[in-house]
UniProtKB/Swiss-Prot annotation:
GO terms for biological process: phosphate ion transmembrane transport. The gene is pstB. It is found in: Cell membrane. It comes from the Bacteria. This is Phosphate import ATP-binding protein PstB. Part of the ABC transporter complex PstSACB involved in phosphate import. Responsible for energy coupling to the transport system. Keywords: ATP-binding, Cell membrane, Membrane, Nucleotide-binding, Phosphate transport, Translocase, Transport. InterPro entries: AAA+_ATPase, ABC_transporter-like_ATP-bd, ABC_transporter-like_CS, P-loop_NTPase, PstB-like. Gene3D superfamilies: P-loop containing nucleotide triphosphate hydrolases (3.40.50.300). Its EC number is 7.3.2.1. ATP binds at residues 62-69. It is an enzyme of class 7 (translocase). Belongs to the ABC transporter superfamily. Phosphate importer (TC 3.A.1.7) family.
């Protein structure tokens, strides 16, 4: 039994061991079919079809305003925070349509963590930042919380840097450390999927490298979907890449193929810098 459920059973509607039909010998974690999304009268996503594999890094690239961030925010339904949003189509997560209004968004966010563009630690201690999620899910035992905090900080490759200052305010960390703390906070709820929306765009090159190395470690246990403007980053760290343009998926393939032999001229034009 995991640390998160050792103190109190967390009730969810999704079975973490559900299996989907394999694609390239992988199981599908998200299967998006005929997704359309509007902000009011603006048609932001158009007929999106993507099958995203488990325990891979999937990069979403494309110019500003192409729908990258909108798409990733549909995967945990954060996009619904915009009052004028409406959608058609389906997004199945382990066989369940998350866009169905009967689907509990709280359950989804237990399985799907999110890391944002700018580090956003809570105005709390380092310890409390990581313990917050487990506490919300009913974990009260101090020993169990201590174990979760250490495991999560180790998973985010920041334990050795903060183990002697856990009671200090998280705002005292550097930008790169804050982002890794946010990743640790995400890991503490034991998600299956980690969504990353431009997670290194506000960081210096050294901190960016640390995050990229961490992503490669995390994909052994998690499915990672990352939005990035940095095409070199996408080429370095992802297994699959989707190129978005004007709200559409132009091309989705193995990253090596996208960057060396794209099948669509628009993809080649974008990655070669002819526009964007």
């Amino acid at each position: 039994m995991s640390l998160l459920t050792a103190d109190k059973k967390v009730q969810v509607d999704i079975n973490k061991n559900d299996k989907k039909a394999p694609v390239n010998n992988k199981n599908i974690v998200y299967d998006t079919k005929d997704l359309n999304l509007w902000y009011g009268e603006t048609h932001a996503l158009k007929d999106i079809n993507l099958a995203i594999n488990e325990k891979e890094v999937t990069a979403i690239i494309g110019p500003s305003g192409c729908g990258k961030s909108t798409y990733i925010k549909t995967l945990n339904r954060m996009v619904e925070l915009v009052p004028t949003v409406k959608t058609t189509g389906t997004i199945t997560y382990r066989g369940k349509n998350i866009l169905d209004r009967s689907f509990k968004v709280e359950d989804l966010r237990t399985h799907v963590g999110m890391v944002f563009q700018k580090p956003n630690p809570f105005p709390k201690s380092i310890y409390e930042n990581v313990a917050y999620g487990p506490k919300i899910h009913g974990i009260k035992n101090k020993k169990v919380l201590d174990e979760i905090v250490e495991k999560s900080l180790r998973g985010a490759s920041i334990w050795d840097e903060v183990k002697d200052r856990l009671n200090e305010n998280a705002y005292g960390l550097s930008g790169g450390q804050q982002q890794r703390l946010c990743i640790a906070r995400c890991l503490a709820i034991e998600p299956n999927v980690i969504l990353m929306d431009e997670p290194t765009s506000a960081l210096d090159p050294k901190s960016t490298l640390r995050i990229e190395e961490l992503v490669q470690e995390l994909k052994k246990d998690y499915s990672i979907i990352i939005v990035t403007h940095n095409m070199q980053q996408a080429a370095r760290i992802s297994d699959k890449t989707a190129f978005f343009l004007n709200g559409e998926v132009v091309e989705f393939d193995d990253t090596d193929r996208i960057f060396t032999k794209p099948s669509d001229q628009r993809t080649e034009d974008y990655i070669s810098g002819r526009f964007g």
